[in-house]
Amino acid sequence: MSGVNEIRSTFLDYFAKAGHEVVPSSSLVPKNDPTLMFTNAGMVQFKNVFTGMEKRAYDRATTAQKCVRAGGKHNDLDNVGYTARHHTFFEMLGNFSFGDYFKDRAIELAWTLITKEFGLKPDKLLVTVYADDDEAAGLWKKIAGFSDDKIIRIGTSDNFWQMGDTGPCGPCSEIFIDQGPALQGGPPGSPDEDGDRFLEFWNLVFMQYEQLEPGVRNPLPRPSIDTGMGLERMAAILQGVHSNYDTDLFRALIDAVAHAVSRAPEPATMASYRVIADHLRASSFLVADGVLPGNEGRGYVLRRIMRRAMRHAEILGAREPTMFRLVPTLVREMGQAYPELMRAESLIAETLKLEETRFRRTLERGLSILDAESRDLREGDKLSGETAFTLYDTYGFPLDLTQDALKARGIGVDTDAFAAAMQRQKQAAREAWKGSGEAATETVWFGLRERVGATEFLGYETENAEGIVTALLRDGAEVTTLAAGQTGLVLVNQTPFYGESGGQVGDTGLILAPGVRARVTDTQKKLGDVFVHHVTVEEGTLSLDQPVELKVDNVRRKAIRANHSATHLLHEALRQVLGDHVAQKGSLVSPERLRFDISHPKPIEADELARVEDIANAVLLQNAPVVTKLMAVDDAIASGARALFGEKYGDEVRVVSMGLPVDGEAAQPRARNFSVELCGGTHAARTGDIGAITIVAESAVGAGVRRIEALTADAARRHRAEEARTLAALAGILKAPVSEAPDRLTALMEDRRRLERELAETRRKLAMGGEGGPGSGAQQTEIGGVAFRRSVIEGLDMRDLKPIVDEEKKRLGSGIVAVVGIGPDGKAGLVVGVTDDLTARYDAVGLVRAGAGALGGKGGGGRRDMAQAGGPNGAGAEAALDAVAQALTEAA
C-alpha cells in the first residue's frame, strides 16, 4: 500500500470506519470567503461550522481536499520545481471533529493510522506540542509511549493556530519522521531544523479557545479538532523517496512530459519537468472548478501558472502547444478520485491549447519589445517599472516573465515602480466609477433585518398580494413617509415582487393603498431575504405600518418567466451539442431578451448554434409542464439536478424540471426530464408558453467564456420576420430567388477577392517599377558601407508593403530597405527590413521606431530582420525615411 490513490483511499476509509462522514473536496474557489483567493487547507469548507454559524448533519468529517497556494500571502509559485516539496496544487488529507471528540481521541486515531495502517515504525517518529500544552504531551506519552526527548515543546506561533485576529484558536501538535542520518538537518526547534532529515507530515490542531481581543482568550464550550496531512509528503515517506516529485503520480506525469517533448529528463533540466508536472495539476483543477485564464484576480494567477509551465516547455524544446497533450495522463491518474476532472477533460485541454497558442504570440511580441527597451541596459541595471507595466497592461506580458527573460543578463526590474503604475491604474478605474448612492444604505440592511425580519416571498404562487410597510428609506436614511413626487425604498412584510438574483432582473409594478399610488421601478434582494422595492410615489403619501396592495406587472413578468425557462433549455442543449464541459458562468434574464454566458474555449460554429436552437425548440413543442419542488440539496443533486458553479445553496432548494428527453435519451444521469436544475427564479408554467427560442448573437466575453443572446415568444417571432424581410430585400438586390441568394452572394465575394488580389499585384509591380527594375522614385545610397534603399509608394497599405520589402532585400543581397506606403486616407505605414547578414549589427525595430515619429506614430514592433510602424501623417513620409537614415548613420 504505497500508491497515491491507495494512500488516499486508506485514509478516508479508516476515518469512515471511525464514524466520520466522508465529505467531498470543496471547490478550489472558496464560497462566500473574500479573504481567500483559493482554498488552501482542508478546514476552509468547515470554517462556518467551527465558528457555529453553520450546522451540519454530522459532527465528525474526513476529506481529501484540493488545495492551491499560488496567490496572496500563501504563494509557493517561485519555489515550485526547485525544491523537493513545494507545489502550487496539493492534496490535504484531514479529519475533523465539531465539538465531538478532542485531544485524546484525535491523538489515538492519528497514532493508530500511521503505525498500524501505514506501517510507520514508532521509533522513527517524534512530535511537537505547544510549550504550555501539558495535556497533549501527557497524551502522547500515554498513547504512543513517547519519552520526553520524543516530545518537543515549541513556544512559537508554529505550534499555535488562529483562524484570524479573533475567533477559534488553539495549540497544535505536529508529527515528524526521522528519515535517517544520510540527510542533513536537526529536529524541530533546533538551529538546523530546516534540513530534510526530520520531515513534518501531519498537523493536529486542538481548537479549544476563542480569541476575543489581544491577550484575552476564553475556553470554547465545544472544543474541536482540525487536522491536515499532505498526501504528497505521505506518499514520499511510504514510497521511500525524499522528493515528492519521485512518487508514482509525479513519475507518471514527468514521463508524459518527456514523451511530449521527445527528450529524456537530465539533472540540468529536471526543474522544468517538475514545474510542468506541478503546474499541469494546478491549471487543470482550477479550470475544472470554473477558473479561466484572464488579466486579473484568480484568472491572472491561473494564467501565470499556465504560462510559467509553457515557458519551461519551451526551454525543453517544445515549439508547438504541449500542455494539452498531458491532460489524458492526469485524468487517468486522478480522475477516479476527482470525477470533475473527467467531466472537464475536453474544456481543460482546449483551454490549455488556446492559452499556449496565445502565449507563443505574446512571448514573441513581448520579447521583441523587451529586447528593444533593454538594449542599453547593463548587468546590475533595472528595467523601468513603467516599461514593465506597459508590457503587462498593453501586451499581456506578465511581470514574472519579464523578470525571467532579463535574469540571464543580470538585469532586474523596478518592481516598486511597476506596483505604483498598477496602483495608479486601479485608482483611475475607481475614480471613473460613479456610484448610485445606494452604497450609503448597505449598513442599514443588517439592522433592518434584525428589527423587522426577513421578507416572505409570495411570487411563486401569485402576482398580487397584500402586505404591511415595515420600513421606508430615502437618500440612504430611514423615514416615516414618502410623499408624491419622491423616490425611495420600501420594505414590506411579504411581497410577490421578485428581487433581482440569479441573473433574473427584479420585478416592477405598483404598490397601492386608498389614495396612494407608488410605481415600483425595480426590486432588489439584500442579505438573501430582504426584498427592497425601489419606488416613485405618484399619488398620495406612503407611510410606515400602512397596509398596501402589491401588484406585479404581469405582462413583464410573463416575458421574464419565458426567458428564464429558456435559459435552462439552452443550457442543456448547449451541453448536448458542445459537451459536458459547458457550465453557466453568468446570465441576464430580462423581459426583452436573455443573455447566457458559458464556459467554452472557442467560438461556437453556426451549425452548432442551429442544433442548439433546434433541440431547445423541440422541447417547446412538447408543451410539457415545468415542475418545481422543494428538496434537500443533497437529495436534489443525487437525483440528477444540476447545481450552478459558485452558487451557495441552503439545506432546502427549489428544483426546476422541464421537458422530456430529446431523441429518447435522458441528457442527465438519473433524470427523467430534459432539464433539471436548482433554481430560485420564476418560470413558465409549460414549455409551450415560451413560444419560440431564437439565438441572435454569439460572442466572446473573456478567455474561455462565450456569450449567447436569445429572444423568446413574440420578440423571437418579430426577429425572424425581420430577418425574412431583410433576406428578401437582399435577394431583390442580387436579382435572385431567396433560395439562390447565398450562392449568388458567395460568387460576388469571390469575384471581389480575386479582383482585389489582382489590383494589389498590379500596384506591387508598379511600385517595383516592373518585373526587372527598381521602383520609380526609389533611392539607394551607402551608409557606413551598408546599402540603404528607400522609397515612398502611394496607394499601398501595410500588408502590401511587407512583400515589397522582402523582394527588395532579396535584390540587394546585403543591405537595409525602408519603404513608406501612403493610403488613400493619408495615413502612412513604414516597414524596415534588414538582411540576415546584418541583423547582428542593426535592429529593424530600432530603425522603424526612429522613423515612426515623423508619421505621427508611436513605437513600432516586429523582429530584428523586419519591423513596422504607422501613423496618421502621410506628409511626413520623406522625413520618416530621413530619420531612419540618420539612425543608420549613428549606428554605423
Swiss-Prot record:
Statement: the UniProt record of this protein carries the keyword Transferase: no
Residue positions binding Zn(2+): 564, 568, 679, 683
GO CC list: cytosol
Cofactor(s) in the UniProt record: Zn(2+)
GO terms under biological process: alanyl-tRNA aminoacylation; negative regulation of DNA-templated transcription
Class of enzymatic activity (EC top level): ligase
Catalytic activity field: tRNA(Ala) + L-alanine + ATP = L-alanyl-tRNA(Ala) + AMP + diphosphate
Subcellular location per the Swiss-Prot or TrEMBL entry: Cytoplasm
PROSITE patterns found in the cross-reference section: AA_TRNA_LIGASE_II_ALA (PS50860)
Protein name in UniProt: Alanine--tRNA ligase
